[in-house]
């Protein structure tokens, strides 16, 4: 069964809330809600001491296509799109694992 845009929107919103993403009041040009979550990590750096790093993911759905924006310490890493909300969550989990964080 092919999913409609409304079904993908509902599944996306449910998955975002389930995985700790929050709607902070921002919307896209087409009125979609932008969900965001930030991870913090403190690492010990030789000859420097503790250093805090952050990883932020902003996600929204545009006409049935989940769009993910990645930021590492405030620097934009890029934008990615996925065919379904479940694939987007799986990709976010893998991106975070490679960056040293956990979903």
What feature does the model see in each segment?
Residues 66, 95-98:
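Hydrophobic alpha-helical elements and their junctions with loops/disorder across both membrane
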Residues 17-18, 26, 53, 72, ...:
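Generic detector of low-complexity/intrinsically disordered segments
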Residues 44-90:
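Intrinsically disordered, low-complexity regulatory segments enriched in Ser/Thr/Pro
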Residues 1-46:
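Negatively charged, low-complexity tracts enriched in Asp/Glu with abundant Ser/Thr
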